């Protein structure tokens, strides 16, 4: 995948427009989960080291274009960066489309791009305004690479130079390693609530992986496809034929035991039982101990592991164990030489909860983009960087 890399460029005195992914949760004006900001800080440090004049921007939330609301401001991100170890002042600029002054040894955060009219539909006039701000455009937001928007695609068409930031370059390298030339056996773990939203992912992975593990609501549809009762569990009856087709094409173990509850709540008691014994008023919220152990053994024998999604409602302590066992097995396999890559919001939350971030080979910051790459789709923001790199 040939793109120009920011790390390879001479950036002294150059104006840099970095499109990062700083879309973080904010409560009462404070950042509540800083993973995406932490992932971006090395890019900012590299830009400063190279003597660039640094501008960085992102989307945050879903504001109405043309309407500024404090709730969608990047101010909490600026506050976070000012308290970090960047060592230079960070300031927020709200009106920047007609030009902005940037000095060396400072970082200018350009206010939420989604407030700009034409951002989402990639208006060329807006893209040209972004491009006019810089000498070099740096795309470093893998999480939005599947969207052709003004700040992810359009600006890359018009900027004098368009390149991939360190984070995006690392994402592409890691995903390429997992999907293009995986060490065998390759295992893919796909969780989540619905087969329908992950069907193309499951299809693509069934062709690459030696083994597929399904979890969450997806697993319930596979359980139902085997003829077991699923009670009130979330599942998709109309996708049972698809589940059967996938199960016939790839090795997909179905849980032998499960943890059930009679209501979806943090305090609902969990009952462990054989998968064939789920009652009409019960819902499956996690896998049982036997199933977790079986899956852990499969995981520990894999050489490449792609992980997207938990195997249960791990947010509730009573239904956490399955995902915890799986998480620890992935960490152990990685310690023993496997290459592991994890992506998706719920997966990252599980990694944080179980404290295994440093035990996974690569953690992808992209949700939708991660899945689309896995599906084999072309990511527009990467495609335009390739086009610019290759004349």
Curated annotation (Swiss-Prot):
Name its GO BP terms in alphabetical order: gluconeogenesis; glycolytic process
What Gene Ontology cellular component terms go with this record? cytosol
- Which keywords does this Swiss-Prot/TrEMBL entry list? ATP-binding, Cytoplasm, Glycolysis, Kinase, Nucleotide-binding, Transferase
Subcellular compartments: Cytoplasm
Which enzyme type, at the first EC level? transferase
Q: In which pathway does it act?
A: Carbohydrate degradation; glycolysis; pyruvate from D-glyceraldehyde 3-phosphate: step 2/5
Q: Name one GO molecular function term.
A: ADP binding
Q: Which residues bind substrate?
A: 21-23, 36, 59-62, 114, 147
- The reply to whether Transferase figures as a keyword in the UniProt entry is yes
The highest taxon in the source lineage is: Bacteria
Where do the annotations place ATP binding?
A: 198, 315, 344-347
> Cystine bridges: which residues?
none
Q: Which residues cross the membrane?
A: none
Spell out the Gene3D superfamilies in the cross-references: Phosphoglycerate kinase, N-terminal domain (3.40.50.1260)
What does it catalyze?
A: (2R)-3-phosphoglycerate + ATP = (2R)-3-phospho-glyceroyl phosphate + ADP
InterPro entries xref list: Phosphoglycerate_kinase, Phosphoglycerate_kinase_N, Phosphoglycerate_kinase_sf
Give the quaternary structure: Monomer.
Q: Can you tell me which family this protein belongs to? A: Belongs to the phosphoglycerate kinase family.
| HAMAP family reported for this sequence | Phosphoglyc_kinase
Q: What is this protein called?
A: Phosphoglycerate kinase
**What is the species listed in this Swiss-Prot or TrEMBL entry?**
Actinobacillus pleuropneumoniae serotype 5b (strain L20)
Which lineage is the organism of this entry classified under, starting from the top rank? Bacteria, Pseudomonadati, Pseudomonadota, Gammaproteobacteria, Pasteurellales
């Amino acid at each position: 995948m040939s793109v120009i890399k920011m790390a390879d460029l001479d950036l002294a005195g150059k104006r840099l427009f970095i499109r990062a992914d700083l879309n973080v949760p904010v409560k009462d004006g404070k950042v509540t989960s800083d993973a995406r900001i932490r992932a971006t800080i090395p890019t900012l440090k590299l830009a400063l080291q190279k003597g660039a004049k640094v501008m960085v921007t992102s989307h945050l939330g879903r504001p109405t274009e043309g309407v500024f609301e404090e709730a969608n401001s990047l101010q909490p991100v600026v506050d976070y960066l000012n308290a970090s170890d960047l060592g230079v002042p960070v300031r927020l600029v709200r009106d920047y489309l007609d030009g902005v002054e940037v000095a060396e040894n400072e970082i200018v955060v350009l206010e939420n791009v989604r407030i700009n009219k034409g951002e989402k539909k990639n208006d060329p006039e807006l893209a040209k305004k972004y491009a006019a701000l810089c000498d070099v455009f740096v795309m470093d937001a893998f999480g939005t690479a599947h969207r052709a928007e003004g700040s992810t695609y359009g600006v890359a068409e018009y900027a004098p130079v368009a390149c991939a930031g360190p984070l995006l370059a690392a994402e592409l390298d890691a995903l390429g390693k997992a999907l293009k030339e995986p060490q065998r056996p390759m295992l893919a773990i796909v969780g989540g609530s619905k087969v329908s939203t992950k069907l193309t992912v499951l299809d693509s992975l069934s062709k690459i992986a030696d083994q597929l593990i399904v979890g969450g609501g997806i697993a319930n549809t596979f359980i139902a496809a085997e003829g077991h009762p699923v009670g009130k569990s979330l599942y998709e009856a109309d996708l049972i034929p698809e589940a059967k087709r996938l199960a016939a094409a790839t090795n997909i173990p179905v849980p032998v035991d499960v943890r059930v509850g009679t209501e979806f709540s943090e305090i609902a008691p969990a009952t462990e039982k054989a998968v064939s014994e789920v009652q009409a008023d019960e819902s499956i919220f996690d896998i049982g101990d036997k199933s977790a152990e079986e899956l852990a053994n499969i995981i520990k024998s894999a050489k490449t592991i792609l992980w997207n999604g938990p195997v249960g409602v791990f947010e509730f302590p009573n239904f956490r164990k399955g995902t915890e066992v799986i998480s620890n097995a992935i960490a152990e396999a990685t310690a023993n030489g496997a290459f592991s890559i994890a992506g998706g919001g719920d997966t990252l939350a599980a990694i944080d909860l179980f404290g295994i971030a440093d035990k996974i080979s690569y953690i992808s910051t992209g949700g939708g983009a991660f899945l689309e790459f896995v599906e084999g789709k072309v990511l527009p923001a990467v495609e335009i960087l390739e086009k610019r790199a290759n004349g």
